[in-house]
């Protein structure tokens, strides 16, 4: 086997690809990163317009992985601040605390509804003790852990708004991983005894954040790579040529033309569905068929510049109700006061969509008008206060975890794993719901494997990604 890894081509300039590139560059390897967008970062980028800054939905950084935490803190230096997480759920024309606070829920939903929630939860737990049932869908899992009433009140509407399909079609494997270990009982316990996220990472009270937006992490990674390597934005990968389960070259194209480049190792964080279709010769039919069945959810972000110092005091506001077209709001100035000019603020609304649907195809003016009208109806702003706007469409923002997705992914993993110099990584690359820290760790661990391979030795079992010298550049 060829253990040389002097030239590494990284296909995708999101957090995973950039983290891999940074670690590999610091280890002295030659790196080229290709990103189809005009800017690096993927979904973790910050948009700047007229002195206002906003992320594509707001992305917090929180991790329990010491190495990833050190990697980001070392990278960002003095740019990081600590932010308190304060979130609300807008439901039935009321605001509820998230995480759940029992008294808030009791007075908000009313005692009869609260009693019904607790009774349903108790009944589900008793039913589970008598006969365990298979939890195939999100609906199965949530009803088992929260009860039918809570599912109908909150989880059903919000989940179907976010994912665009019925809860019975959303995989339980995803939701179990996403809010692992969380149940109604634990949420109530957390409300009375604050853990600050120690035991329930999805309920972390504080997180770190760059003063100028989450995109600064991607920008700093790019700067590190470009000390000796190359990051090419606006450059699309169109083909991967292979022989004997070894990638031999990649065809890339940008405004200057196309080129075929050779590398020793290839890291792909692009959507796994795109990767499979780019392989030349084409994969077997059953592999192409599996890839065609995996789908992504798209995102449209509408940001409104507002002539007011502050609108809310929240990190996020979740809106499950179907009569409101967006699913979440955040106010970047509550994350960092440098995200808007003095005396002004900015509100960001997230519209979940499928590419080609009415939301995706609506023009910017229509989307802006829709956001303003609904925010005004909710009592947040007045139309006269809006002094500017921006609309950003993010295709393939989130893998869509339909029932059966894992079996499809396993087919692709098994096939792609046969290529000796191809490494798939990241959220879209692995078709997994990675938070920021997972995306970064995926890049670090992929880089570690390549570094060990280039040194002619395999990483010990379970030690991938633990190369501190490569991570910290020392």
Segments predicted by a language model, with ranges:
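Dinucleotide-binding Rossmann-like beta1-alpha1 core, especially the glycine-rich loop
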Residues: 50-129
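A short, Lys/Arg-enriched amphipathic alpha-helix followed by its capping loop at the start of a domain
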Residues: 20-29, 228
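FAD-binding beta-loop-beta segment adjacent to the flavin cofactor pocket
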Residues: 337-342, 395-424, 428-430
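Beta1/beta-strand and adjacent pyrophosphate-binding region of the FAD-binding site
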Residues: 2-16
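Active-site/ligand-binding neighborhood in enzyme catalytic cores
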Residues: 105, 119, 123-245
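A conserved FAD-binding loop/helix module that cradles the flavin
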Residues: 428-450
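Glycine-rich FAD pyrophosphate-binding loop
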Residues: 11, 25-48
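Mid-domain catalytic core of redox enzymes
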Residues: 27, 235-384, 392, 464-468, ...
């Amino acid at each position: 086997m060829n253990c040389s890894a002097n030239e590494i081509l990284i296909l995708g300039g999101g957090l995973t690809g950039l983290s891999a590139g940074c670690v590999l560059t610091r280890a002295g390897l030659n790196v080229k990163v290709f990103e189809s967008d005009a800017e690096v970062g993927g979904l973790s980028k910050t948009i700047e317009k007229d002195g206002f800054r906003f992320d594509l939905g707001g992305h917090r950084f929180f991790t329990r992985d010491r190495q990833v935490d050190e990697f980001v803190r070392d990278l960002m230096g003095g740019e990081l601040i600590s932010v308190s997480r304060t979130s609300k759920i807008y439901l039935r024309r009321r605001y509820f605390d998230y995480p759940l606070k029992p008294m808030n829920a009791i007075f908000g939903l009313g005692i009869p509804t609260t009693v019904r929630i607790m009774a349903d939860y108790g009944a589900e737990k008793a039913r589970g003790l008598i006969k365990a049932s298979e939890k195939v869908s999100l609906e199965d899992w949530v009803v088992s852990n929260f009860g039918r009433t809570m599912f109908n009140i909150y989880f059903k509407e919000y989940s179907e708004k976010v994912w665009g399909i019925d809860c019975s079609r959303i995989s339980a494997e995803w939701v179990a991983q996403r809010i692992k270990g969380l149940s109604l009982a634990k949420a109530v316990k957390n409300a009375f005894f604050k853990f600050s996220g120690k035991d329930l990472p999805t309920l972390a009270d504080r997180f770190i954040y760059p003063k100028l937006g989450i995109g600064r992490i991607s920008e700093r990674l790019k700067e590190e790579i470009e000390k000796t390597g190359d990051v090419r934005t606006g450059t699309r990968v169109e083909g991967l040529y292979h022989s004997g389960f070894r990638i031999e070259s990649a065809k890339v194209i940008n405004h200057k033309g196309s080129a075929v480049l050779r590398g020793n190792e290839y890291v792909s964080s692009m959507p796994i569905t795109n990767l499979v279709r780019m392989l030349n010769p084409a994969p077997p039919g059953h592999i192409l068929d599996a890839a065609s069945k995996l789908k992504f959810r798209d995102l449209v972000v509408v940001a409104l510049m507002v002539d007011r110092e502050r609108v809310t005091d929240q990190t996020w506001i979740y809106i499950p109700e179907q009569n409101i077209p967006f699913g979440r709001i955040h106010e970047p100035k509550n994350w960092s006061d440098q995200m808007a000019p003095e005396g002004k603020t900015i509100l960001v609304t997230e519209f979940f969509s499928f590419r080609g649907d009415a939301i995706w195809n609506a023009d910017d003016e229509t989307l802006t008008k829709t956001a303003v009208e609904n925010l005004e109806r909710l009592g947040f702003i007045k139309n006269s206060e809006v002094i500017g706007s921006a609309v950003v469409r993010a295709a393939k923002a989130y893998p869509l975890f339909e029932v059966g997705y894992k079996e499809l992914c396993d087919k692709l993993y098994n096939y792609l794993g046969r290529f000796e110099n191809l490494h798939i990584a990241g959220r879209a690359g692995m078709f997994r719901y990675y938070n920021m820290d997972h995306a970064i760790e995926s890049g670090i661990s992929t880089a570690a494997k390549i570094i060990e391979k280039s040194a002619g030795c395999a990483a010990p079992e379970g030690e991938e990604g633990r190369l501190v010298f490569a991570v910290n550049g020392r």
